[in-house]
A protein has these predicted regions:
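N-terminal cap/leader regions of alpha/beta-hydrolase-fold enzymes
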Residues: 1-226
Length: 226
């Protein structure tokens, strides 16, 4: 099963989501978007995790403000994406992530994996939602939410040269939450895992993906092949 469908959050809001469900899947993964919407890159991540055997969806979190948002990785895209992220706000976005988790829970254990804006939402999900694992890639607001306590096993990926997230903040997150697995990728920049960005680092992206799959499996979120 592949395609778009409508999710309904607990406040009645309806939003689009892109979904791929391989036959026989026994675990779910929610891919939480960057500030660029559910664009081709995010859909490719859904496809990639589904290829590993996970029932995978990406909810369109900007639907609360504007439908069908797919932004480019350029100056105007960044500016518009930041405006949309600020307009959505954390609480409504978390309602939509929760709807995605609930949708997948009939399949089995569910993990959330977020990128940039979504990385910070993955951090919040670890403390607020019934997820088996949470993974955040370069979540720029995690440090500002450092007082939140993850209840689910949590893995965080950061780039050493991320212009938006100083290493001092990364170290403070790691020190404040010693149970959280934190990895810093040498010479990697913000967005290093996205092959549509100039900052893409293939080696760091591959290592982070491998670590993510191992982390999910260690916490009971397994693909079909596992």
């Amino acid at each position: 099963m592949t395609g778009n469908f409508r999710l309904t959050a607990d406040d009645g809001h309806q939003l689009d989501a892109y979904e791929v469900c391989p036959e026989g899947a026994t675990s779910g993964v929610v891919i939480i978007q960057e500030i660029f919407g559910v664009n081709p890159h995010i859909r490719s991540l859904v496809d990639r995790y589904a290829a590993q055997g996970f029932h995978t969806i990406a909810p369109a979190l900007f639907d609360r403000v504007e439908s069908d948002v797919e932004l480019d990785y350029d100056g105007p895209g960044i500016e518009r994406g930041r405006d949309l992220a600020m307009a959505v706000r954390w609480e409504p976005a978390m309602r939509d992530v929760a709807a995605a988790v609930t949708h997948l829970s009939v399949t089995g254990p569910v993990a959330v994996i977020g990128y940039c804006f979504g990385g910070s939402l993955a951090w919040l999900s670890a403390g607020e939602l019934p997820v088996a694992a949470a993974v955040g890639y370069y979540g720029g607001q995690i440090h500002g939410l450092i007082d939140r306590i993850p209840q689910a096993p949590t893995l965080l990926h950061f780039g050493e040269l991320d212009h938006a997230i100083p290493l001092e903040q990364v170290y403070e997150i790691a020190e404040t939450h010693p149970s959280v697995e934190v990895h810093v990728y040498g010479q990697a920049q913000h967005g290093f895992s996205c092959d549509a960005r100039d900052s893409y680092d293939a080696d760091s992206a591959a290592l982070a993906f491998e670590r993510t799959l191992s982390f999910l499996a260690a916490n009971g979120v397994t693909g079909i092949a596992a």
